[in-house]
Amino acid sequence: MNAIEAQHLKHLTHWPDEIINAIASVEEAEIYMKAGLKPARIGNRWALVRSDINWSDYSVRRNTWLKNKLADYSKWVDYNNADLIGEGFPPRDVNGDPYELHHIGQRQDSPFAELTWAEHMGDGNNTILHKAGKESEIDRQQFEHEKSDYWKARFKAFSPSELRKIYGK
């Protein structure tokens, strides 16, 4: 993305420079804008976060196929999305699919974007977000730890009023 495009994107979105500078193309930015993502500081990193996750929702009970996958199914049966992220796991959409974290700019220290699978990999987005032929700079083992830490930090970012709304107390 050239300087004029970056300046225009900043004017449109008001995203911080750390996010703008990590975005490689206008097409990439459009994916994040179409998803309605907003900037937030989560832990020690900038991220583009979703506002449409229902933190009170998601019951493992609705997805009985998980009984066969989880040895400790009974532990998770009453967890909602907020509980999941508090444990370091991604929240789930209404279908039970996990939201994904994407490194904006594909560098280890890049800001994250919270995306659905379709936003991340579907409809040609995979080739926009992951440049073909370019070696990934992401250490996958480190990323596994970062994802867990990110979701825990996302939970800690809830305000007391948000927690009351989630848990109805």
Question: Whereabouts are the PLM-identified features?
Answer:
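Nuclease and nuclease-like effector domains acting on nucleic acids or nucleotide cofactors
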Residues: 1-99, 105-169
